[in-house]
Design a protein with these regions (language model features):
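Short acidic, hydrophobic short linear motifs in intrinsically disordered regions
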Residues: 42-53
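Residues within the helices of the helix-turn-helix
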Residues: 37, 47-48, 66
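Amphipathic alpha-helical dimerization/coiled-coil segments
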Residues: 97-161
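Short, cationic-aromatic polyanion-contact patches
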Residues: 16-32, 46, 79-105
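Glycine-centered, phosphate/nucleic-acid-interacting loop/turn motifs that mediate DNA/RNA or nucleotide
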Residues: 43, 72, 78
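Short, locally clustered residues in the helix-turn-helix/winged-helix DNA-binding domain
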Residues: 28, 37-41
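Long, low-complexity, charged/polar intrinsically disordered regions in eukaryotic proteins
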Residues: 1-20
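Short amphipathic alpha-helical interaction segments
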Residues: 55-70, 76
């Protein structure tokens, strides 16, 4: 396998072991991946829509949604809706920033709008840039080393494309 034969996604994971374990359990499951793929990236996704839109049992769906909330992939809330004379409470979920990154990781690239790709790459780069600065400060590494690497890779890519 060559250096260019790698998956070009880098995803941050939480520090807490329990949250990482929950995320891995979601990503290793067909139920978890299906639910993530069916989440709205911007806006609420209602629990009832996930139950109607998949072939999995209510119990499995609710269990995986709870795992995702515990892992900080999703935030949840309740909404009261009036239908006729009845008031019904419905549960909704929205992806956190971390959740959006995992959803985008699972989606085919052609389904992701270019402006969302740009925004997401900026967010992830910001997280890694702040981590690199912290590591450089803690270990006495010159930050210019990383600037040079980025400039070299950009130059190599530009030369290759011309």
């Amino acid at each position: 396998m060559g250096d260019n034969d790698i998956w070009h996604y880098i995803l941050p994971f939480p520090f807490e072991n329990e949250k990482r374990r929950l995320i891995w359990s979601v990503l290793q499951s067909k139920v978890g991946k299906t639910l993530l793929m069916n989440m709205n990236l911007d806006g609420r996704t209602y629990q009832r829509d996930l139950i109607k839109g998949t072939s999995y049992s209510n119990k499995s769906i609710i269990e995986y949604l709870k795992r995702m909330v515990s892992a900080d992939i999703l935030e949840q809330g309740m909404e009261q809706v009036t239908t006729g004379k009845r008031k019904v409470r419905i549960k909704w979920y929205v992806p956190t920033k971390l959740g959006r990154w995992f959803i985008l990781f699972l989606k085919p690239t052609e389904e992701i709008p270019p402006d969302l790709v740009r925004k997401t790459i900026e967010e992830i780069f910001q997280v890694y840039a702040s981590s690199i600065v912290e590591v450089c400060e803690n270990f006495g590494i010159d930050i210019d080393l990383f600037r040079k690497i980025l400039n070299k890779e950009y130059s190599n890519k530009t030369i290759t494309e011309t």
